[in-house]
């Protein structure tokens, strides 16, 4: 299942993916091989989960929603499978010691087993420096795909570059 948490579905997405995926409401517990569930309006909605679900987080708020629910259940219903967290930035740093800072930070410190996948060695090193611990962690170095790289090389002739430092 793909659960969309940040935006509503648009017709273009439905047109593109409807041959391969079944689009379901979050409260629909029917099982299909591939489903997409829009949950951007999740404040008053529920999501059926099972012991076969694995959650992959791509932002702290996606992690927080699921981790908090498992904590609220207190182990009465289901214990989660290991969480998988794609970490692309140090997200608490966007929130300047606020309550959002603490919420973002808490998702890295969950008591549940969690696999961290970092998008750079530098980011992984920073998390190690801050003392975050994960069940397992992996690092990949993102690369520019061949099509964009080819296009970028042609643009160098047309774009004037200058080095700039921003201090705030």
Where are each of the predicted segments found?
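N-terminal pre-catalytic "stem/leader" segment of glycosyltransferase-like enzymes
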Residues: 1-51
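Nucleotide-sugar donor phosphate/pyrophosphate-binding loop at the beta->alpha transition
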Residues: 39-40, 91-108, 146
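Membrane-proximal helix-turn-helix segments that form the acceptor-binding/catalytic region
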Residues: 44-51, 77, 98-117
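Short N-terminal targeting/anchoring amphipathic segment
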Residues: 45-65
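Active-site proximal beta-strand in glycosyltransferases
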Residues: 54-56, 73-93
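A short, active-site helix/loop in glycosyltransferases that binds the activated sugar's phosphate group
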Residues: 65-66, 94-96, 100, 112-137
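Short beta-strand->alpha-helix junction loop in the catalytic core
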Residues: 89-91, 122, 139-150
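Conserved donor-binding/catalytic core segment of Leloir-type glycosyltransferases
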Residues: 117, 157-168
